[in-house]
Amino acid sequence: MSTGFFGNLQPISYEGPQSDNPLAFRHYNPDEVVLGKRLEDHLRFAVCYWHTFVWPGGDPFGGQTFERPWFGDTMERARLKADVAFELFEILGVPFFTFHDADVRPEGASYSESVARLNDIADYIAAKMEKTGVRLLWGTANLFSHRRFMAGAATNPDPDVFAYAAATVKACIDVTKRLNGENYVLWGGREGYETLLNTDLGRELDQLGRFLSMVVDYKHRIGFKGAILIEPKPQEPTKHQYDFDVGTVYGFLKRYGLEDEVKVNIEQGHALLAGHSFEHELALAATLGIFGSIDMNRNDYQSGWDTDQFPNNAPEAALAYYYILQAGGFTTGGTNFDAKLRRQSLDPEDLVAAHIGGMDICAQGLKAAARMIEDKALSGPLEERYSGWNATEAQAMLKGERSLEAIAERVARENLDPKPRSGRQEKLENIINRYV
């Protein structure tokens, strides 16, 4: 039985690029075959629980603007929230969803009550998954909202908070496994510090390393087949976060011997906060062998914080999916919309329209990326740029067959005087726009 929240809205269909129907897909046809795979299987779209069904529409200067019938701290409201969530999943035709424990159940008076409520709602959600065929892309624990975590979870100076966080993650991994989740995510929003004056940096990093090692050990002990993912972010809410960016996370994983066990979930907005482009973080993660999944959104170009808006820039999406496809595409990961409505967008239809737009932009970007790969539009010029390294002498230098002295001798003997060559950046940028 329908909740009635979305009125008479029917499942969204593909009508093609010429359609002017605001509630239809113009670029996303889930069954369209691209590079030998259905578009749905390339993109693996997911709707997130937190921004879509939990966020009240507040900002630092004003409170709640959204009035949702499921808002409240009872299990009855939690079940209504799940009812509405799965209605949206079916309207959009998305194959996946994502959640934090605190998104799906109200906080209990104790740890045990919170876990009992999580298990209760997990049974309810499992029945809906069975009925609809919608799957869980990943689960995670909210270790940042409650005041107990104000000084961190794994990095907290109080060992009891560390223990509480560890127990919470165990419960969330258990539920993620029970719901056949394909990944488990850890985001360290409070894992960092505001000032070094009250922070033992080395101790906190070691605590975080031990915590993550326990998570990996537990995954293997219970036979959870999904990937463990860290989501990098440089700041916000914490001033200095330990999972700053992909490079920082990789260094952390190497230090604690976890580089073969943990991958990254990369968010577009977090990449920008770290001073990088989205494609930089994607390409680096792929190069380092730790690419896992993405949170797709965008930040406002003028604001200096994480605005979590729905994506609307096709060239940016094309570059992102270009590097994802070059890395072999998603395996357990997917495209999770970590994006929220603007606080004035009050209508149920706004939730649908926002996701339609995001899904269309991603589809448009991926199809452009696929065409660039097929035509070698970017890889051809790249191969040419580095072609000199195919020469015998160049290969000998790379393989360690030439010492510094031997190279210096050859440079002097051959009177080498290399001339600069154009990087052709503008031509390459024009290619992106042409394919989009």
Swiss-Prot record:
Q: What do the Gene Ontology cellular component annotations say? A: cytoplasm
Where does this protein chiefly localize?
A: cytoplasm
User: What EC number(s) does the entry state?
Assistant: 5.3.1.5
Which cofactors does it use? Mg(2+)
Q: Where in the cell is it found?
A: Cytoplasm
Q: What keywords appear on the UniProt entry? A: Carbohydrate metabolism, Cytoplasm, Isomerase, Magnesium, Metal-binding, Xylose metabolism
Q: Its family? A: Belongs to the xylose isomerase family.
Q: How does it assemble?
A: Homotetramer.
Q: What name does the UniProt record give this protein?
A: Xylose isomerase
